[in-house]
Amino acid sequence: GLPNVAKLFEATAQAELIHAAGHLKAPDKIQSTLDNLQDAIDGETHEFTEMYPPMLQEATTENHKARVMFGFAVAAEEVHAGLYKKALEAVREGKDLEVTDFYLCPVCGYIELGARPERCPICNTKGEKFVQYQA
């Protein structure tokens, strides 16, 4: 319907990736791993409870195709918050996460720890398409 507005969103999404990479390289302040994990939990929780739900609602109301991606984002961000919580618990115990393999769904952003899933539980993408990250 509105291709130029769509392009704006696409360009902004890429800009956000650039910003995120920049923040990782040069954080505004040096914090402990515990603080960084808590900030990550807070950020992910904000995204799946406050930021994406109104976008999802509006896209659904307008029957816009973006509703699918917003739905994926809500679900994936909740998973991310849970993973950061697991990491926070481990660090509080003086440990690292025990898993060494991480699998990222290239469609919705879901992350699976340990073993490649058969299919993504959020978007149903085949597990063979997941991107593996190893320590």
Regions found by a protein language model. Give the residues of each.
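Non-heme di-metal
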Residues: 1-135
